[in-house]
Amino acid sequence: MIETIQADWIKSEAINLENCCNDNPLKILGPHFYEEQWVIRVWMPEADEVKINFKNNTYKAESINHKWLFEAILPENPNFNYEINISRGGITHTQHDPWSYREEWMGEVDRHLFAEGNHHHIWEKMGAHLIEEKNQKGVMFCIWAPNAKSISIIGDINSWDGRHHPMQKRLGGIWELFMPTMKEGDTYKYEIRTQQGHIYEKADPYGFLHEIRPQNGSIVSKLKNFNWNDSSWISNRDSSSQINKPISVYEMHLGSWLHESTDNKYLEDNGEPRDPVPAADLKPGTRLLTYPELTEKLIPYVKDRGFTHIELMPISEHPFDGSWGYQVTGWYAPTSRFGTPNEFREFVNKCHEEGIGVILDWVPGHFPKDKHGLAFFDGCHLYEHGDSRIGEHKEWGTLIFNYSRNEVRNFLVANLIYWFEEFHIDGIRVDAVASMLYRDYLRPDGEWIPNENGGNENIEAVKFLQQANHVLFQHFPGALSIAEESTTWPMVTKPTDMGGLGFNLKWNMGWMHDMLDYFEIDPWFRQFHQNSVTFSITYNYTENFMLALSHDEVVHGKSHLLHKMPGDDWKKYANTRALLTYMWTHPGKKTIFMGMEFGQRQEWNVWDDLQWELLEFEPHKGIRNLIDDLNALYKNEAALWKNDFDPYGFQWIDCNDKSNSVISFMRRENDTNEWLVVVANFTPNTHGSYKVGVPVEGFYKEIFNSDGSRYGGSNKGNMGGKETINYNIHDYQNALELALPPLSVSIFKHLSKK
């Protein structure tokens, strides 16, 4: 054993390693050239004996200055081509040296782009990556934690003992370690020691797979190992703007759409049953469906209904079912509740094969305080603001991202690109945008901080949203970016180069509240609230609006859509059909929440599944038939979608018949005379000869009637259509004399010939 004048230094470094306080293990560990010799130092806690295997020779490593620090002398530079033979408690195994890999994984260009917030593929560097270096397979770990005192990899590989595998701190607060002993499927966390000496066990913010709740470790997973066959879909999607096409969205929550008996286990490809993931105590003996089962059952169902897109409530990994997915801890991982990342890829792939787009709810506005998550990540407020007046949603119990920090914005923007690139999704809906835009959102006076100009706008969040949308459309020009924004913030759907937020669709929350308020009123009193049903057109062209009846409107005592309606069951069904038909004829893209398509009666409950048994009853079948036919009509009649955002596409015929609660309007595609006339009767009265003015004489075919018997209605109508009569009304010389069924919406199409 060579003598060294650095004995005290080596002993000090070894003590730091034992106490998990060393941020530079490569300084002492691995191969070093010293006094004309190659020295290898190995850190092996609780090892009894260590040997080095190199070029068919074995060299004993002696313990130096610390019982777990071993040193051996080799005759030449070993590079990466040696192995360590370790004996512990009578058990011997051989492995490569984690500290023999000395090159930086994250290079200068990567660090620079990340530091300025512009590394749009940062997930290809951060996190856990299965790689092969110098013929040795293993896992490269990389994490950003600039304020940590030390970080170790912990997992089954080392009995979750942070003393075994300290990471190397690099420039820019990056930590790295190559683990040649780890493989796909291994569970791990980062053990982070703070400057104050506290120890946190954190899941990987960039992890591609996590354990099923209640466990919360990260799992080593391959990234690029799926064969897509949707290239034509992606090409068509990105060749033109999607907002000028029909968009009808089925919003849903994967965990509460349909449950399965725990006795009926999902079988893996090898025939082995998969451990079931229990649904909830509310329905003992039931389990969640897997991604493959959802592929088999959900996609045909949505296709049969005629929806163009599925919108999934958040599927990023989250620990608490009751958050509905909106309190995310695993931003780069589809939740393991339903299966593997590749199984989710196959779900998206199959959606595209069947002509269905996939929209994900994305939650960049806040994150939970779970100890294994982003909160106080490296002992400091790294991802969140330190001041709770700008860094916390107290009402929600969550933290707010610090959008002024480049690396935090990079984490989020890259995450957005990740879902499109790695999972081929077609759109996002950004949740709770208003909570991001305003510093005083849900805050009383004295509990928020004005911006630099003294206002309540969150300037940093605005810039983040603009950056996210700008980058998204740079990479994926055919993407959908939908804002759930509940205020009158201007230019939400205007391009960023015009000063807008850059979304291309915005949920019309005003329309939704007005319509639900209107339909909850007894029909006999609706005449006093006519403005509620007509007001939306006055601002309809200020943004690119999507009409949404979402999950938020069927929870927390609000009742499901059917039970919001007044009157007996017949009137509830008729009102529901009338509202849905009016929605499909009103300008704007469409979104409804699962269960509305067949008249769910109970409020949505995340722990339960839908009331599928209701489809045994004709009125509920009728509502589902209505949705099927509305979606078919919607896609076939360009007048219903082509000019959603152009005033040319809509014209009132009469919006002032308050006493009858009747409205009528036209939808137009182009300058031909084949427009649609829509007439809505929002009372139970039947009108036998109601006159509606039209601009051109001829035959108007009745192409839809929400009162049809197929939908559970009374089947009153106009015998297939009407010829105009010479009658001056509504500033037109021609009119249709129509039968208006009770609580109904009828659609007529002008034809050049009968």
From Swiss-Prot:
One of its GO terms (molecular function) is hydrolase activity, hydrolyzing O-glycosyl compounds. This is 1,4-alpha-glucan branching enzyme GlgB. NCBIfam families: branching_enzym, PRK05402.1, PRK12313.1. The active site is at D431 (nucleophile), E484 (proton donor). Keywords: Carbohydrate metabolism, Glycogen biosynthesis, Glycogen metabolism, Glycosyltransferase, Transferase. Gene3D superfamilies: Glycosidases, Golgi alpha-mannosidase II, Immunoglobulins. Pathway: Glycan biosynthesis; glycogen biosynthesis. GO terms for biological process: glycogen biosynthetic process. HAMAP family: GlgB (MF_00685). Pfam families: Alpha-amylase (PF00128), Alpha-amylase_C (PF02806), CBM_48 (PF02922), GlgB_N (PF22019). Monomer. Belongs to the glycosyl hydrolase 13 family. GlgB subfamily. It catalyses: Transfers a segment of a (1->4)-alpha-D-glucan chain to a primary hydroxy group in a similar glucan chain. InterPro entries: A-amylase/branching_C, Branching_enzy, GlgB, GlgB_N, GlgB_N_E_set_prok, Glyco_hydro_13_cat_dom, Glyco_hydro_13_N, Glyco_hydro_b. The keyword Glycosyltransferase applies. It comes from Prochlorococcus marinus (strain MIT 9215). Its EC number is 2.4.1.18. Catalyzes the formation of the alpha-1,6-glucosidic linkages in glycogen by scission of a 1,4-alpha-linked oligosaccharide from growing alpha-1,4-glucan chains and the subsequent attachment of the oligosaccharide to the alpha-1,6 position. It is an enzyme of class 2 (transferase). GO terms for cellular component: cytosol.
